[in-house]
Amino acid sequence: MTETIKVSESLELHAVAENHVKPLYQLICKNKTWLQQSLNWPQFVQSEEDTRKTVQGNVMLHQRGYAKMFMIFKEDELIGVISFNRIEPLNKTAEIGYWLDESHQGQGIISQALQALIHHYAQSGELRRFVIKCRVDNPQSNQVALRNGFILEGCLKQAEFLNDAYDDVNLYARIIDSQ
């Protein structure tokens, strides 16, 4: 059975699965132009098969506990993704990534999903340190981190190559002890 985290009456997180390939590919295509302003990977999504391979890899990583990828559903419609892009089990640390369909932004959906995800894994004792890295010139993502109790720990200079330039990246973290 697919892991599900209930966020609210209308929002749920579903662990990535094979049946998400087609709607995920369609959502990426719909949002590709603006996604490429902040993320490098959308340029490499050329077909549904590319998405299938990514999903299959993430299913395996999810099962092994080295990453967790969740689809964000609003009333049974796929509207975005939130994930632990990398998990360090020994350190109980997870690096978080997220993106949302452009038409659903500005409604607090990512914040709600983020809170539900980190609390679910903090309460289980699996994770305690949560990290968000975002480009300095991505104000929306920086605001998500700050609004959700993450503390700016520093700025990584020229840490991310995107659109023919090296960009500075802010590193935010939040620690939640389950005790």
Swiss-Prot record:
Family from the record: Belongs to the acetyltransferase family. RimL subfamily.
Compartments where located: Cytoplasm
Keywords: Acyltransferase, Cytoplasm, Transferase
Its EC number(s): 2.3.1.-
Cross-referenced Pfam families: Acetyltransf_3
Protein's GO biological process: protein modification process
Name listed for the protein in its UniProt record: Ribosomal-protein-serine acetyltransferase
Phenotypic effect of disruption: No longer acetylates bL12.
Function: This enzyme acetylates the N-terminal serine of ribosomal protein bL12, converting it into the acetylated form of bL12 known as bL7.
Domain of life the protein comes from: Bacteria
InterPro entries in the record: Acyl_CoA_acyltransferase, GNAT_dom, Ribosomal_N-acetyltransferase
Disulfide-linked positions: none
One GO cellular component term noted in the UniProt record for this chain: cytoplasm
One of the record's GO molecular function terms: protein-N-terminal amino-acid acetyltransferase activity
Main location (coarse class): cytoplasm
Catalytic reaction list: N-terminal L-seryl-[ribosomal protein bL12] + acetyl-CoA = N-terminal N(alpha)-acetyl-L-seryl-[ribosomal protein bL12] + CoA + H(+)
Species: Escherichia coli (strain K12)
The gene coding this protein: rimL
Domain N-acetyltransferase per the UniProt entry, residue ranges: 11-172
